């Protein structure tokens, strides 16, 4: 049974402005595994990746009904599988979590659905 759905839309240039003012922003949003991948990318790809993870984690927190605050960005990890599909690999949710991240123009959108296994 679906127990939560959250979406988030993020302007990539807004994330880039924050990152350019303070590169430690990436450390706040990304887990160690996500950060290791991030460091391998070109600047443009870093910004789309960071914005996508931000949107994905915001969408997850909305699906949980808490928003970021009761959860932290470090509580949630999103890693791409071998086909390039984003997968939530770490979270406080005990059921199944599904995520989709899409980039278009200067924006990134993420949607998360939470399914209870009981």
Swiss-Prot record:
Keywords for this protein: Cytoplasm, Fatty acid biosynthesis, Fatty acid metabolism, Lipid biosynthesis, Lipid metabolism, Magnesium, Metal-binding, Transferase
Requisite cofactors: Mg(2+)
Swiss-Prot/TrEMBL GO biological process terms: fatty acid biosynthetic process
Entry annotated with the keyword Metal-binding: yes
GO CC annotations, alphabetized: cytoplasm
EC nos: 2.7.8.7
Pfam family name, one: ACPS
Amino-acid positions noted as binding Mg(2+) in the UniProt annotation, renumbered to this chain: 8, 58
Subcellular location(s) per record: Cytoplasm
Superkingdom as given in the UniProt entry: Bacteria
Biological function: Transfers the 4'-phosphopantetheine moiety from coenzyme A to a Ser of acyl-carrier-protein.
Family: Belongs to the P-Pant transferase superfamily. AcpS family.
Protein name: Holo-[acyl-carrier-protein] synthase
Species name: Streptococcus equi subsp. equi (strain 4047)
Gene from which the chain derives: acpS
């Amino acid at each position: 049974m679906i127990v939560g759905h959250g979406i988030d839309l993020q302007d990539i240039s807004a994330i880039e402005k924050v990152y350019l003012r303070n590169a430690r922003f990436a450390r706040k949003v990304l887990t160690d595994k996500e950060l290791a991948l991030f460091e391998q990318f070109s600047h443009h790809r870093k910004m789309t990746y960071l914005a996508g993870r931000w949107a994905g984690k915001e969408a997850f927190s909305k699906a949980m009904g808490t928003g970021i605050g009761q959860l932290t960005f470090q509580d949630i990890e999103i890693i791409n599988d071998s086909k390039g599909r984003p997968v939530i690999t770490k979270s406080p949710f005990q059921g199944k979590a599904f995520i989709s991240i899409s980039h278009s123009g200067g924006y990134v959108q993420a949607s998360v659905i939470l399914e209870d296994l009981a």
